[in-house]
UniProtKB/Swiss-Prot annotation:
GO terms for cellular component: cytosol; nucleus; proteasome core complex, beta-subunit complex. This is Proteasome subunit beta type-2. GO terms for biological process: proteasome-mediated ubiquitin-dependent protein catabolic process. The keyword Nucleus applies. The 26S proteasome consists of a 20S proteasome core and two 19S regulatory subunits. The 20S proteasome core is composed of 28 subunits that are arranged in four stacked rings, resulting in a barrel-shaped structure. The two end rings are each formed by seven alpha subunits, and the two central rings are each formed by seven beta subunits. The catalytic chamber with the active sites is on the inside of the barrel. Transmembrane segments: none annotated. Belongs to the peptidase T1B family.
Length: 199
C-alpha cells in the first residue's frame, strides 16, 4: 500500500515517502506517519513494510551508523550505508529476526562529489547508483513516466515537477487513498525538507 519515490541526478537526490498508515488492508488509520530515518548530515533512508519492522529496523540502522560516526570521527558514505543496510537485511533473512522492509537510501557523497540513490528490498536485493527508483505497488505506474521524461541534467524544479507527476499518477490510478507525502532533497549544500505534497 505504501509508496516511496526517489529521483537522482549528479547534483541532487529527491526522496518522497507517503505519510499513511494502513490497517486491515486499505483502511487509512493515520496520515502523519514519518517513514524517514536520517542516517547522516547528507544521508537519509525512507523505509516501508511491516510497521513494527520498519520502526525497529529504521531505528537500529540509524543508531548503528551514528555509533560508527562517533567511534571513527566521520560519517559513512551513501554507498557504504547502502551496503550496510543490504548486508543487515541479508543477515536477518538467514535468522529468525528477519525484517520485512523495503528502503530507499539517498544522499550526497562529498568525496565523489555526486548524489547517490539506492534501494534494498526485503530479500536484500540491492540496487545502487540509480537515476530513479520506486518502492511500493504505485511504482508500476511511474516507471513509464520516468523512462520518457527523466533527464540527467534536470534542474531541481524539473525534478520536483517530475516527482509530482508520478505522485499524481499514483493518486489517480491506485485504489488506496494516500493523502500526503513527505519530500526531502539532498545536494552539495546539505539536507532540506520541502513542503509536503497533500491531496
Amino acid at each position: 500500500m505504501h509508496f516511496l519515490v526517489g529521483i537522482s541526478t549528479e547534483n541532487y537526490v529527491i526522496l518522497a515517502a507517503d505519510k499513511a498508515t494502513f490497517a486491515y488492508g486499505a483502511i487509512l488509520a493515520d496520515s502523519e506517519n514519518d517513514k524517514e530515518y536520517r542516517l547522516g548530515k547528507k544521508l537519509t533512508m525512507m523505509c516501508i513494510g511491516e510497521e513494527g519492522d520498519v520502526a525497529q529496523f529504521g531505528d537500529w540502522t540509524k543508531r548503528n551508523l551514528q555509533l560508527y560516526s562517533v567511534r571513527n570521527g566521520y560519517e559513512v558514505s551513501p554507498s557504504c550505508a547502502h551496503h550496510f543496510v543490504r548486508r543487515s537485511i541479508a543477515e536477518g533473512l538467514r535468522s529468525q529476526d528477519h525484517y520485512t522492509v523495503d528502503v530507499l537510501i539517498g544522499g550526497y557523497d562529498d568525496k565523489e562529489d555526486k548524489a547517490f540513490l539506492g534501494s534494498v528490498d526485503y530479500l536484500a536485493n540491492g540496487l545502487g547508483q540509480q537515476p530513479y527508483l520506486f518502492r511500493g505497488f504505485c511504482g508500476r505506474f511511474c516507471y513509464a513516466i520516468m523512462d520518457r521524461e527523466y533527464k540527467k541534467d534536470m534542474t531541481e524544479a524539473e525534478g520536483l515537477a517530475l516527482m509530482n507527476k508520478c505522485i499524481g499518477e499514483a493518486k489517480r490510478r491506485f485504489v488506496a487513498n494516500i493523502p500526503g507525502y513527505k519530500v526531502v532533497i539532498i545536494d552539495k549544500k546539505g539536507y532540506r525538507k520541502l513542503d509536503d505534497v497533500l491531496f
